[in-house]
Amino acid sequence: MRLDFLDEFKDPYMRTPLGQGVFLAGVALGYLARFQVEGEKDLTSAPLFKQLEFGRMNMKSLKKLLARIPKLLAAYKEGMKYGGLISALAAEANGLILKGEEQELGVDGNFAFTTGFASAPTYFWKIFGKKPEGDDDTA
């Protein structure tokens, strides 16, 4: 897992363990949501997407979503090629969140989460290496 690109972010929130954890949580959940729609272009139809309150998420709701990842991965394990990578990324996000100062997400946290979620395929492959040839951006 390569996370050195996080050092390139100049945003003060993204320089904290909490900010990095929230961002990585967005990447993990965003990639998982893309699997739920299995290649469809309309990410908004993903069940996970419908549960998110973009811009109004708090730490409690984020932790609830992260706690559900193992169950979601188990439910979707058939046909999911990268479930282990999503699990590892979620574990890293959880660890960083636990290392950070306990605080509400606020504007900075919601922005970091949404950025990770919206750009999940790009950052997922930046973290785990080059996307295999011919693969789409579903898990």
Predicted regions and their residues:
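Intrinsic-disorder/low-complexity detector
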Residues: 1-139
